[in-house]
């Protein structure tokens, strides 16, 4: 860390902002418990990944430039999403091959951008959390977090410190859920088959709750589980680690009361 209390900017992500703000609050709570000074830059916008994956490099570049400008001056940038963090860390610099100034700025941003749980364990050295959840969970490894950022052991390490919780592994935790951002729109039949297979694996564990670190995956799997009449609850891993499962109903369910 660069100082006793690193200054961390939270990249909220579009899906957290629009569908699950509790995840953002959970991320702030965890980061503050880890000793960070947390700020949420108000001018932040989409990371540009949907445009990038669709081949729209012009709009992806424009969005990336906005993000680069909004997140200057922080020690670290942290996102509760391996997908968005991976976009910034691995794809931004190449967007500015024709712009040396922004190429340098984007490389600097990429070097200090992290997925939330891996930042907590690998950068600030968090060993355990002060949370409790009675029951069993299973964990889905989101593609970008796993393959671009190496996020696998980190969430399991912290989940194993949650009192009352047991973690049951999927038979194939690394298999894609079929979301893939715009993939599920471009190839809906393939996406449905993939998420159906994934949900079969989830239900076979007997776990009461499904966790993951990316809202896109969670929304996709929650929707399929609900259509199949499953009672499995679906949550972002940050909500469990922060002890905030009472603050919002499971994904896809209405809050009672």
Regions found by a protein language model. Name each.
Residues 1-257:
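Iron-sulfur cluster-binding electron-transfer modules in prokaryotic oxidoreductases
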């Amino acid at each position: 860390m660069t100082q006793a209390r690193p200054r961390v900017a939270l990249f909220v992500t579009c899906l957290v902002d629009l569908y699950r703000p509790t995840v953002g609050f959970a991320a702030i709570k965890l980061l503050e418990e880890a000793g960070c000074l947390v700020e949420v830059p108000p001018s932040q916008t989409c990371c540009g990944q949907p445009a990038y994956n669709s081949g729209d490099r012009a709009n992806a570049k424009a969005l990336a430039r906005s993000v680069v400008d909004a997140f200057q001056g922080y020690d670290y940038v942290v996102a509760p999403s391996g997908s968005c963090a991976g976009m910034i860390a691995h794809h931004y610099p190449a967007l500015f091959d024709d712009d040396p100034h922004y190429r340098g700025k984007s490389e600097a941003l990429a070097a200090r951008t992290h997925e939330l749980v891996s930042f907590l364990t690998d950068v600030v050295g968090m060993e355990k959390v002060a949370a409790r959840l009675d029951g069993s969970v299973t964990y889905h490894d989101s593609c970008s977090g796993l393959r671009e950022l190496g996020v696998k052991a980190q969430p399991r390490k912290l989940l194993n410190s949650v009192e009352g919780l047991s973690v049951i592994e999927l038979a194939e935790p690394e298999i894609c859920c079929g979301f893939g951002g715009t993939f599920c729109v471009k190839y809906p039949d393939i996406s449905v088959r993939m998420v159906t297979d994934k949900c079969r694996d989830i239900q076979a564990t007997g776990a009461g709750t499904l966790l993951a670190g990316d809202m896109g995956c969670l929304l996709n799997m929650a929707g399929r589980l609900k259509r199949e009449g499953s009672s499995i609850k679906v949550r972002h891993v940050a909500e469990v680690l922060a002890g905030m499962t009472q603050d919002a109903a499971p994904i896809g369910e209405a809050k009672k009361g």
